[in-house]
């Protein structure tokens, strides 16, 4: 069985042979972490074009090994709140073994092309595997236009523990700018569209990231309030959806503190 070190070397060689990215001539590193970074940079930058069977087999083995390196987090491992069907999970959304996780996408819906970028879109696309970008490309080709803010699309999660990924594009807020009612409503639409799609797909568990609060600059406090209020209102309007368990995933300590506070009924997100 080839090691991760060797698998990375073979994948890097195949990707560099294509000469599709600015990293095609970089020398092969001798350190594991450097190889991981180079492979990720190559696959992040690679256009949504078909891949060879040889590469896909190597990537499948490598990502299967990655998937086996941690214990997935299920709903029962998540923190309970004062709302029966709402849970909290503080950590890496890629580790959640739920029916679907929500990805904060961009309007191209093809993932992040910035090498080794720290956004959730990059992390999800990298470790779901390159088939995800190809699946998203197929959706965008059929759609024939950029993805609108507040809509939602469903794909397989491929190598992630989750079964599916729901992709939604949130609104951007310029730093220091007030959150307008229009942008607040657009963020709420992201949650409603994702919930509607989850029910349509027959899902029973859905994990939301903090949409728009990263690279898109939406203030965390307002975003948390909108997220929780929107989900609670949607649940009240869809009593048939009681079987859908909803998880709010937080990654920063600030987000965790906000959701911990707002998911106590007496605070009511005010």
Swiss-Prot record:
<keyword id="KW-0479">Metal-binding</keyword>
<keyword id="KW-0326">Glycosidase</keyword>
<feature type="binding site">
    <location>
        <position position="212"/>
    </location>
    <ligand>
        <name>ADP-D-ribose</name>
    </ligand>
</feature>
<dbReference type="GO" id="GO:0004553">
    <property type="term" value="F:hydrolase activity, hydrolyzing O-glycosyl compounds"/>
</dbReference>
<feature type="binding site">
    <location>
        <position position="106"/>
    </location>
    <ligand>
        <name>ADP-D-ribose</name>
    </ligand>
</feature>
<dbReference type="Pfam" id="PF01661">
    <property type="entry name" value="Macro"/>
</dbReference>
<feature type="binding site">
    <location>
        <position position="215"/>
    </location>
    <ligand>
        <name>ADP-D-ribose</name>
    </ligand>
</feature>
<feature type="binding site">
    <location>
        <position position="216"/>
    </location>
    <ligand>
        <name>ADP-D-ribose</name>
    </ligand>
</feature>
<keyword id="KW-0862">Zinc</keyword>
<feature type="domain" description="Macro">
    <location>
        <begin position="73"/>
        <end position="267"/>
    </location>
</feature>
<protein>
    <recommendedName>
        <fullName>Protein-ADP-ribose hydrolase</fullName>
        <ecNumber>3.2.1.-</ecNumber>
    </recommendedName>
</protein>
<comment type="similarity">
    <text>Belongs to the MacroD-type family. Zn-Macro subfamily.</text>
</comment>
<feature type="binding site">
    <location>
        <position position="119"/>
    </location>
    <ligand>
        <name>ADP-D-ribose</name>
    </ligand>
</feature>
<feature type="binding site">
    <location>
        <position position="121"/>
    </location>
    <ligand>
        <name>ADP-D-ribose</name>
    </ligand>
</feature>
<feature type="binding site">
    <location>
        <position position="214"/>
    </location>
    <ligand>
        <name>ADP-D-ribose</name>
    </ligand>
</feature>
<feature type="binding site">
    <location>
        <position position="112"/>
    </location>
    <ligand>
        <name>Zn(2+)</name>
    </ligand>
</feature>
<feature type="binding site">
    <location>
        <position position="92"/>
    </location>
    <ligand>
        <name>ADP-D-ribose</name>
    </ligand>
</feature>
<feature type="binding site">
    <location>
        <position position="119"/>
    </location>
    <ligand>
        <name>Zn(2+)</name>
    </ligand>
</feature>
<dbReference type="InterPro" id="IPR043472">
    <property type="entry name" value="Macro_dom-like"/>
</dbReference>
<feature type="binding site">
    <location>
        <position position="213"/>
    </location>
    <ligand>
        <name>ADP-D-ribose</name>
    </ligand>
</feature>
<keyword id="KW-0378">Hydrolase</keyword>
<dbReference type="GO" id="GO:0051725">
    <property type="term" value="P:protein de-ADP-ribosylation"/>
</dbReference>
<comment type="subunit">
    <text>Monomer. Interacts with the lipoylated form of GcvH-L.</text>
</comment>
<feature type="binding site">
    <location>
        <position position="120"/>
    </location>
    <ligand>
        <name>ADP-D-ribose</name>
    </ligand>
</feature>
<feature type="binding site">
    <location>
        <position position="117"/>
    </location>
    <ligand>
        <name>Zn(2+)</name>
    </ligand>
</feature>
<comment type="function">
    <text>ADP-ribosylhydrolase that specifically reverses the SirTM-mediated mono-ADP-ribosylation at an asparatate residue of GcvH-L (SpyM50867), by releasing ADP-ribose from the target protein. May play a role in the regulation of the response to host-induced oxidative stress. It can also hydrolyze ADP-ribosyl-glutamate bonds and ADP-ribosyl-cysteine bonds. In vitro, it can remove the ADP-ribosyl modification from the human mono-ADP-ribosylated PARP1 E988Q mutant, which is primarily modified on glutamate site with only minor aspartate contribution.</text>
</comment>
<dbReference type="InterPro" id="IPR002589">
    <property type="entry name" value="Macro_dom"/>
</dbReference>
<dbReference type="GO" id="GO:0004649">
    <property type="term" value="F:poly(ADP-ribose) glycohydrolase activity"/>
</dbReference>
<feature type="binding site">
    <location>
        <position position="93"/>
    </location>
    <ligand>
        <name>ADP-D-ribose</name>
    </ligand>
</feature>
């Amino acid at each position: 069985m080839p090691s991760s070190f060797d698998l990375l070397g073979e994948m890097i060689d195949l990707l560099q042979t294509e000469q599709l990215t600015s990293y095609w001539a970089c020398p092969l590193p001798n350190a594991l972490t450097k190889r991981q970074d180079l492979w990720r940079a190559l696959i992040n930058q690679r256009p949504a074009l078909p891949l060879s069977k040889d590469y896909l087999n190597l990537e499948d083995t490598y990502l299967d090994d990655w998937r086996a390196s941690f214990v997935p987090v299920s709903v029962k491992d998540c923190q309970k709140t004062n709302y029966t069907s709402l849970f909290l999970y503080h950590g890496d959304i890629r580790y959640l073994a739920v029916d679907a996780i929500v990805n904060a996408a961009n309007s191209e819906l093809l993932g992040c092309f910035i090498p080794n970028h720290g956004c959730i879109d990059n992390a999800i696309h990298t470790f779901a595997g390159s088939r995800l970008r190809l699946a998203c490309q197929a959706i965008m080709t059929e759609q024939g236009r950029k993805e609108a803010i507040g809509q939602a699309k469903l794909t397989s999660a491929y190598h992630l523990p989750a079964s599916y990924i729901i992709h939604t594009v949130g609104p951007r807020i310029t730093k220091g700018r007030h959150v307008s009612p229009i942008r607040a409503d657009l963020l709420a639409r992201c949650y409603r569209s994702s919930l509607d799609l989850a029910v349509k797909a027959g899902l029973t568990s859905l994990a939301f990231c903090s949409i728009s609060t990263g690279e898109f600059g939406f203030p965390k406090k307002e975003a948390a309030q909108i997220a929780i209020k929107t989900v609670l209102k949607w649940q009240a309007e869809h009593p048939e959806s009681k079987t859908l368990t909803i998880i709010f995933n937080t990654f920063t300590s600030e987000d965790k503190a906000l959701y911990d506070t707002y998911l106590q009924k007496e605070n009511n997100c005010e």
